[in-house]
């Protein structure tokens, strides 16, 4: 049994519910995982996080931080689902800008750019421009 072997080696088993095939994305699926000995779940779905918490599982809610509107909805979702941890993605946006800027299509960096340093960092990583609603940064 993979779960028992992992536990014997001091590892915790967290199931990514958004990617796991063959397991219902509902209360029954969560109960099944808890019965199998899984330690917790990862999911973008607040309802899955709530079900898992009710089943006594450890929870990580995953968020994609794309823009300031999305950040606002993250706070609301966290308040409703109360995960044990959150994962905010992407974690390495500078690296992604650099990778794509080496191609033939120009890259514009946008979303969550709030400071002059963030503008210059995006340009330094290879973006040709920055898209922001922050008027103070329009003339940087």
Give short role names for the model-derived ranges.
Residues 1, 14-21, 36-49, 60-68, ...:
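Catalytic beta/alpha-barrel core
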Residues 3, 30, 49, 74-75, ...:
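Generic hydrophobic/aromatic pocket-lining and core-packing "Φ" positions
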Residues 6, 33, 52, 77-78, ...:
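Generic structural signal for hydrophobic
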Residues 6-18, 37, 55-64, 101-110:
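Short beta-strand/loop segments at the ligand-binding rim of alpha/beta enzyme cores
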Residues 19-24, 65-69, 94-95, 115-116, ...:
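Short, small-residue-enriched loops and turns at beta-alpha junctions
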Residues 36, 55, 80-81, 125:
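Structural motif
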Residues 47-48, 90-96, 111-140:
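Glycine-rich phosphate-binding active-site loops on the catalytic face of alpha/beta enzymes
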Residues 73-101:
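Strongly charged, low-complexity linkers/loops
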């Amino acid at each position: 049994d993979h779960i028992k072997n992992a536990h014997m080696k001091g590892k915790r088993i967290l199931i990514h519910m958004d990617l796991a095939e063959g397991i219902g994305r509902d209360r029954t699926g969560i109960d099944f995982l808890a019965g199998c000995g899984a330690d917790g779940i990862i999911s973008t779905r607040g309802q899955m996080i709530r079900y898992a918490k009710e089943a006594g599982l450890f929870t990580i809610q995953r968020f994609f931080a794309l823009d300031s509107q999305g950040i606002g909805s993250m706070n609301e979702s966290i308040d409703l689902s109360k995960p044990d941890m959150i994962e905010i993605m992407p974690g390495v946006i500078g690296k992604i800008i650099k990778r794509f800027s080496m191609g033939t299509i120009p890259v514009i960096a946008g979303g969550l750019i709030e400071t002059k340093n963030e503008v210059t960092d995006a340009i330094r990583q290879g973006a040709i421009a920055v898209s922001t609603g922050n008027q103070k940064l329009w003339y940087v």
